[in-house]
């Protein structure tokens, strides 16, 4: 009995993640989180998109700002945040992404450049549209985020789904992310719509909660 009581006492002090509710927010089904928490973390410092994506994810799960302590060692320490890798075909990864979000769990996604036609600048990019939260809804802004390199790509925290997404016919553009490159713009929350054919299927495409 004494041992059981000690175990229960120790467990009481362990961090407990909770699933975040997926709710419609001005036309985007977004995991619930305190906007001020994400804004306080802000945009990434150079080369640390993976760490910042992890911090956003843990902040959503824990309901408090994640400092990122112990989650970086010349690269993101996924296990320190309770995340593990998931690989598969593009269709399998997108289905996993959908199911994780539906269960209230943010997913870290690895992006690569894709070539976009019909644009004058930055034909190779990881995204095109971002949405700034205002008092009256989302302002759509054309702001291409360029992957830092073809070697490392770019990591984002996916936290939203289009309300029109078909679970049996998913594409990257059905999902919305907290992008470490621009999670805040002029003091407002910004979410980025993923661009089709940017999921880096061949190179650690997803990190999911273990």
Q: What are these model-predicted stretches?
A:
Residues 44-47, 56, 72, 89, ...:
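Solvent-exposed loop/turn segments at secondary-structure junctions
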Residues 92-178:
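Active-site-adjacent substructure of cysteine-protease-like catalytic cores
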Residues 3-12:
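Bacterial N-terminal signal peptides
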Residues 156-159, 173-210:
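Aromatic- and glycine-rich peptidoglycan recognition patches
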Residues 70-96, 101:
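Substrate-binding cleft of extracellular glycoside hydrolase catalytic domains
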Residues 21-27, 83, 87, 106, ...:
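Post-signal peptide N-terminal regions of Sec-secreted extracellular proteins
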Residues 14-79, 133-148, 170-172, 185, ...:
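Active-site-adjacent structural segments surrounding the nucleophilic cysteine of cysteine proteases
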């Amino acid at each position: 009995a004494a041992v059981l009581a000690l175990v229960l006492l120790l467990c009481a002090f362990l961090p407990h993640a909770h699933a975040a509710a997926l709710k419609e927010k001005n036309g985007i089904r977004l995991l619930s989180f305190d906007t001020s928490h994400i804004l306080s973390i802000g945009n990434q410092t150079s080369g640390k998109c993976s760490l910042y994506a992890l911090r956003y994810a843990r902040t959503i799960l824990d309901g408090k700002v994640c400092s990122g302590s112990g989650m970086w060692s010349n690269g993101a320490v996924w296990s320190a945040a309770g995340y593990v890798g998931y690989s598969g075909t593009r269709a399998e990864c997108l289905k996993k992404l959908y199911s994780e979000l539906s269960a209230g769990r943010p997913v870290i996604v690895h992006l690569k450049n894709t070539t976009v036609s019909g644009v004058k600048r930055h034909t190779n990019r990881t995204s095109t549209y971002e949405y700034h939260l205002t008092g009256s809804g989302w302002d759509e802004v054309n702001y291409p985020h360029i992957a830092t390199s073809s070697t490392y790509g770019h990591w984002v925290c996916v936290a939203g789904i289009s309300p029109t997404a078909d679970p049996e016919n998913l594409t990257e553009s059905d999902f919305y992310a907290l992008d470490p490159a621009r999670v805040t713009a002029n003091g407002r929350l910004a979410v980025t719509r993923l661009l089709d054919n940017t999921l880096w299927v061949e190179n650690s495409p997803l990190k999911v909660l273990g």
